[in-house]
A protein has these predicted regions:
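"…together with the soluble PPM/PP2C metallo-phosphatase catalytic core" -> "…together
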Residues: 1
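Helix/loop segments that flank and initiate small ligand/metal-binding modules
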Residues: 4, 29, 167
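A structural detector for beta-sheet-dominated domains
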Residues: 4-6, 19
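Short linear motifs in intrinsically disordered
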Residues: 6-9, 48-52, 195-199
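Short, flexible, glycine/charge-rich loop motifs used to bind or transfer phosphoryl groups or to couple energy/partner
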Residues: 6-7, 39-41, 124-125, 178, ...
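Alpha-helix initiation/capping motif
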Residues: 6-8, 70-71, 95, 140, ...
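Substrate-contacting helices/loops that form the catalytic groove of nucleic-acid
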Residues: 11-14, 21-162, 234-264
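Positively charged, low-complexity nucleic-acid-binding target-recognition regions
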Residues: 152, 156-264
């Protein structure tokens, strides 16, 4: 079998598993031991901390005001996916042409999933590289998936993104704090701390009734996420889940992660 190497393996693998996906593609998953110290030295301490507000209008808004647009991979591919699905439905069951059409549909969906996966990887790596500590809100994804926002929620893939942040933070000695989903991040003024009450989703800006500060809804929420996670003062690189760290979903095996200590 021909293999396309994306990088050199860091160690001799102890086993390899060959996987065939629904789109007819083959992948080889290697199990090997890595040096935890080498991972830690690749990501030196930054002393920076950030809060992240995940959403639909923007994929993420950071506490420093950075807004990351949602790529909307699924919505951009909808016409092509629907066309491929219609062609599949017209083919006779059990025929070779139907199998070809099925593979075409599967590959179209795989292309969307791959693009989303790559976007998550690039953004999560950037955030882990730039920040010693990260705060993110736990989202009720299952509940949102039953609303009119279901397609946008599925397209964003928040759970997979947060999972990447978790395993990369553990691997590279970063601190990741997840705050409760019921924390009133969108209701609280980040300037004075006054809780201003619930606000419908269409309200993108609001003015605090106590101090008069005009807030961008998502930026304000990101600042509150950072504060609620206890990251506002400083990031010190405290120990992050020392020991074995589960590999991400697309990988097999486990990674070693060293404990980190905060300098006095």
């Amino acid at each position: 079998m021909k293999v396309r190497w994306s990088r050199t393996l860091p160690a001799q693998p102890s086993s390899v598993t060959v996987i065939k996906d629904a789109a007819g593609r083959y992948f080889a998953s290697f199990v090997l031991d890595t040096d935890p110290a080498a991972d830690a030295t690749r990501m030196p301490d930054t002393g920076q901390a950030v809060g992240i507000d995940l959403g639909v209008a923007h994929f993420a808004v950071l506490s420093d005001g950075t807004k990351i647009e949602s790529p909307r991979f699924l919505r951009r591919a909808e016409k092509k996916l629907k066309k491929a699905q219609r062609e599949l439905s017209r083919k006779q069951k059990g025929s070779k042409n139907r199998e070809k059409a099925r593979l075409k549909v599967a590959r179209a969906h795989a292309k969307v999933a791959d693009a989303r996966h790559e976007f998550h990887h690039q953004l999560s790596t950037q955030l882990i590289r730039d920040n010693q500590a990260i705060g993110v809100e736990e989202l009720a994804v299952n509940g949102l998936a039953r609303t009119r926002l279901a397609k946008s929620v599925h397209d964003a893939g928040w759970s997979a993104f947060v999972h990447m942040l978790e395993y990369k933070a553990a691997r590279y000695g970063r601190t990741l704090v997840k705050i409760g989903r019921f924390e009133p991040t969108s209701q609280t003024c980040s300037a004075c701390g006054t809780k201003d009450g619930p606000k419908p989703l269409h309200v993108r800006q609001w003015t605090c009734t106590a101090c008069g500060t005009l807030h961008d809804r998502d930026h304000n929420a990101a600042i509150n996420v950072k504060t609620a996670a206890g990251l506002a003062a400083s990031a010190c690189g405290a120990p992050v889940r020392p020991g074995l760290v589960p590999a991400q979903r697309a990988e097999t095996g486990r990674h070693g992660s060293p404990p980190e200590t905060c300098a006095a």
